[in-house]
């Protein structure tokens, strides 16, 4: 397994729309393993392949405190099941150190393939619903900062660019 490099906003590669996975093979399973290792090391609770510069529709997630609930979503799709919205303070491994409130549908149906390529479906609410929507946004080239006002988004962008310049 390997720790992968996580792209950071405003890297334009984060805007790439990921392509569907045609076949879940050993290469995809290795990507899943590497993504879990990267996510746990970061540490985070979710990671989309786009964030590690692999533009395939793959998401890993683990909302548990003890890394006991790893979830894999290959070619995930979600459908809101309610008009009710929840507001969560979201953060992102690609926007390190920043947290902002984002409104998202409270309940969603998720369809995806598992690590073995088997289709499954689940109904998600709360944090799981928020996370799958957040990670699917990554696969579509969208970040949580896109839900913010342009003023807030520009402020975050400038702060991160300054940090990147100082690290160079």
Swiss-Prot record:
The keyword Secreted does not apply. Fe cation binds at residues 92, 134, 138. Keywords: Hydrolase, Iron, Metal-binding, Protein biosynthesis. The gene is def. PANTHER family: PEPTIDE DEFORMYLASE. The active site is at residue 135. GO terms for biological process: co-translational protein modification; translation. Belongs to the polypeptide deformylase family. It catalyses: N-terminal N-formyl-L-methionyl-[peptide] + H2O = N-terminal L-methionyl-[peptide] + formate. One of its GO terms (molecular function) is peptide deformylase activity. It is an enzyme of class 3 (hydrolase). Binds 1 Fe(2+) ion. Its cofactor is Fe(2+). Its EC number is 3.5.1.88. HAMAP family: Pep_deformylase. InterPro entries: Peptide_deformylase, Peptide_deformylase_sf. It comes from Stutzerimonas stutzeri (strain A1501) (Pseudomonas stutzeri). Removes the formyl group from the N-terminal Met of newly synthesized proteins. Requires at least a dipeptide for an efficient rate of reaction. N-terminal L-methionine is a prerequisite for activity but the enzyme has broad specificity at other positions. Pfam families: Pep_deformylase (PF01327). This is Peptide deformylase.
